Amino acid sequence: MVARIIDGKAFASGVRGRVASAVAGLEAAHGVVPGLAVVLVGEDPASQVYVRNKGIQTREAGMASFEHKLPAETAQAELMALIERLNADPAVHGILVQLPLPRHMDAEAVINAIDPKKDVDGFHVLNVGLLGTGQKAMVPCTPLGCLMLLRDTLGDLSGLNAVVVGRSNIVGKPMAQLLLNESCTVTIAHSRTRDLAGLCRTADILVAAVGRPRMIRGDWIKPGATVIDVGINRIEEAGRSRLVGDVDFDSAAPVAGAITPVPGGVGPMTIACLLANTLTACCRANGLPEPDFAEAGG
């Protein structure tokens, strides 16, 4: 048995296409254009690439893109003032502050200064609480993308055993909550978990989000399980640099029923879900029906 390869790149393209269609319809029917503001502080090379890609895809979807680039030495008060202006701007429906921030800034305070209704990253404490109580919330983009891929692959997730390896606020915890909201039986594993390999072998759904290259091997995986690899790790191998996930793909693929590759799996879903969240925020701000992007993107 060789696992079905879950093509996140193709699925994300479908989501972006549906977002673009909905944006065009929104403008034609109501004269409303969703707007996404992205704030970058400093000159982190990876962050610059992410921000550039977000701007390109935002504009391709027919949305307004507002990019604010501030020097690394910017005072936190100045950043807070910018966020306050964006909160008050009716043309801006989504606000994203690119992480990581410079060390002198309090990232938690900055994120919680964003209007929760415009918090398209889903990191504001109010959205975290709403998600945790099963209410309507802005959902973090990467876990939302993972859930879309799981629903497309498996259909109804209720009753399945899910193990999420990693307990970060950005991926692990919200992923576990989303799966719980889907009526899965969920276990969160972390660095102190005993017999991690044995626990992983109980999972019908295994989500790896630990940031350790190829940590999860094929003999950790239940035959036929669906494996979602969130990890993006750059390693040197055979004299060249390459990206690998948290799962050892070569040993996992013959065991799993379905698996996301790295690259081309979860990664493309993140920006697609950011666009979907921005559209959702725009619809909510204008009292309009929200498109449903929770199902298949193709």
UniProtKB/Swiss-Prot annotation:
Entry GO terms, CC: cytosol
Protein species of origin: Paracoccus denitrificans (strain Pd 1222)
InterPro entries: Aminoacid_DH-like_N_sf, NAD(P)-bd_dom_sf, THF_DH/CycHdrlase, THF_DH/CycHdrlase_cat_dom, THF_DH/CycHdrlase_CS, THF_DH/CycHdrlase_NAD-bd_dom
NCBIfam families attached to this UniProt entry: PRK10792.1, PRK14186.1, PRK14188.1
Binding site for NADP(+): G166, R167, S168, S191, I232
Function statement: Catalyzes the oxidation of 5,10-methylenetetrahydrofolate to 5,10-methenyltetrahydrofolate and then the hydrolysis of 5,10-methenyltetrahydrofolate to 10-formyltetrahydrofolate.
Biological pathway: One-carbon metabolism; tetrahydrofolate interconversion
EC numbers on record: 1.5.1.5, 3.5.4.9
Name of this protein: Bifunctional protein FolD 1
Keywords: Amino-acid biosynthesis, Histidine biosynthesis, Hydrolase, Methionine biosynthesis, Multifunctional enzyme, NADP, One-carbon metabolism, Oxidoreductase, Purine biosynthesis
Gene3D superfamilies hit by this protein: Leucine Dehydrogenase, chain A, domain 1, NAD(P)-binding Rossmann-like Domain
CDD domains referenced in this protein's UniProt entry, alphabetically: NAD_bind_m-THF_DH_Cyclohyd
Gene name of this polypeptide: folD1
HAMAP family, alphabetized: THF_DHG_CYH
Molecular function per GO: methenyltetrahydrofolate cyclohydrolase activity; methylenetetrahydrofolate dehydrogenase (NADP+) activity
Catalytic activity: (6R)-5,10-methylene-5,6,7,8-tetrahydrofolate + NADP(+) = (6R)-5,10-methenyltetrahydrofolate + NADPH; (6R)-5,10-methenyltetrahydrofolate + H2O = (6R)-10-formyltetrahydrofolate + H(+)
